[in-house]
């Protein structure tokens, strides 16, 4: 049987490929069969390789096969741009490009009706969450601490407001007070939706609370601890201490009658501290023109009071020299502007950017009235040799446009007037 089986393929090979056995081994029959084997091998090898990634470039790229991020492709956006966790304070899910174009979403523990009093018509735009998802972290992250977009930054997100609020955290036996946002940390998570909602709705609605006139006005509704009173003086240039000393005990007693026994000693000590330090604080932080005149008379100087807001960066020897150029302004009454603006004729206050016309008229001008940018104002005040002239003086031909560097001493500038 084995011999017959060996003869049959040889006979078949002779019929197909030729008479000799060598033709069967190396003849055209193997050449005819080899392309089929190669095709089968190619098919099996091609299927064994995994398919290329849909985001990988094609093997032969040309102008018809460009792989780029399509901002209008929804399927590509949802895969590539994943929303970041809400614990990141600077890249919340409300920012465009991170998490898609989502609407304004409130945390689950805050009712949705709270968004209308302080967000207004901007509640459905791309804005970060007003509070983080964790209720224990409320009021401590600066991007979430009542910072509701560019229109409300001046009211709810300024550093003086947040710095003063965070000084009242370590008060013993303290409960949720009116106008203090850091006390969310002392409220349990299950009570946040019940306790914080009425107070927030009454504090941040412009029409409900008459005391909430400005972000610094809410500083009257709580009292900082005694050891932090020295820190509270710097970021409060606008606070009226006569109202703050009399208003805080009344508000605390009316808002929290059950806690009078625990907070009365603290209130009394804080009021005493305010009365002791009131003179120094008023001299440093007063903004009205009458306070400027009284400070000038009391100190016996002709210079304007110290600028409380960022004046150390912009105040130069040239700036201090400019203050001493107007000795006749010293005897004016408090009703008249001490330093009137040459354009709007309003008072030039300490915290406002002002420019002195050293070219001729020696008048003060608001930076906003002159149209000068903050960058140009910073360069002007940083350069001691720079001289600015108003439009009226520059229109006259009598102004000396070229000066030597030695002519910038105080006698030379006083002689130009």
Swiss-Prot record:
Region (Disordered): 1-71, 175-265, 284-318
CDD domains reported for this sequence: PHD_PYGO1
InterPro entries associated with the record: Wnt_Signal_Transd_Protein (IPR052475), Zinc_finger_PHD-type_CS (IPR019786), Znf_FYVE_PHD (IPR011011), Znf_PHD (IPR001965), Znf_PHD-finger (IPR019787), Znf_RING/FYVE/PHD (IPR013083)
Top-rank taxon: Eukaryota
Compositionally biased residues, Basic and acidic residues: 1-11
UniProt-annotated stretches for the region Interaction with BCL9: 371-389
Annotated TM spans: none
Annotated Gly residues bias: 18-27
Gene: Pygo1
Organism: Mus musculus
GO cellular component assignments: nucleus
Subunit organization: Interacts with BCL9 via The PHD-type zinc finger motiv, and thereby becomes part of the nuclear beta-catenin/TCF complex. Found in a complex with BCL9L, CDC73, CTNNB1 and PYGO1. Interacts with histone H3 mono-, di- or tri-methylated at 'Lys4' (H3K4me1, H3K4me2, H3K4me3); the interaction is enhanced by the interaction with BCL9.
Positions annotated as zinc finger (PHD-type): 338-396
Role, per record: Involved in signal transduction through the Wnt pathway.
Protein name according to UniProt: Pygopus homolog 1
Pfam families per the UniProt record, alphabetical: PHD
Keyword annotations of the record: Metal-binding, Nucleus, Wnt signaling pathway, Zinc, Zinc-finger
UniProt subcellular location: Nucleus
Record's compositionally biased regions (Polar residues): 180-221, 240-256, 284-305
Motif Nuclear localization signal per UniProt: ranges: 35-41
GO MF terms held by the record: histone H3K4me3 reader activity; zinc ion binding
Coiled coil: none
Record region (Interaction with H3K4me2): 339-386
Any one biological process term the GO annotation gives: hematopoietic progenitor cell differentiation
